[in-house]
């Protein structure tokens, strides 16, 4: 059962105030991806969880302020815009396990970079933003991306690499 609209509206606005378009139906998803077919598109799967509030949404804001920016930026809200979220996952993210929050950068209709929940949990917004900026710099240009362009964050230098998020480390 979805959370009350009044509860999630502020969470939606954290992204829409940045100029990110909400996709609330499969038709909205088709229209957005159709418009970005030969361009770049950043998809954010929003969520009510703490790592969305404390990590993902602030990281997106920081990354978009830093630039470069994608041609299009869109969001669906997991658990709220259920049909749109399921459709975007099934249609545009095949083989990628569902998670939220989640971010994917698309270039020419194909996902080229993903940030899954496991790349967000226990990390500071600045670190998540740096990962996203690296992807934007590699893929949001008129030039071909470098051969070593990343496809996911490299967590090997993260303090929590390979372990539990900091909030759960005391129980390991």
Curated annotation (Swiss-Prot):
- Segments carrying the region annotation (Disordered) are 141-172
GO biological process, any? cell redox homeostasis
- The parts of the chain that form a coiled coil are none
Task: Kindly list the cysteine pairs connected by disulfide bridges.
Answer: none
Which stretches does UniProt call biased (Polar residues)? 154-172
Extract the PANTHER family matched here. BACILLIREDOXIN BRXA (PTHR40052:SF2), UPF0403 PROTEIN YQIW-RELATED (PTHR40052)
Protein family (similarity comment): Belongs to the bacilliredoxin family.
Protein known as: Bacilliredoxin SRU_0242
Which source organism? Salinibacter ruber (strain DSM 13855 / M31)
Q: What is the lineage of its organism?
A: Bacteria, Pseudomonadati, Rhodothermota, Rhodothermia, Rhodothermales
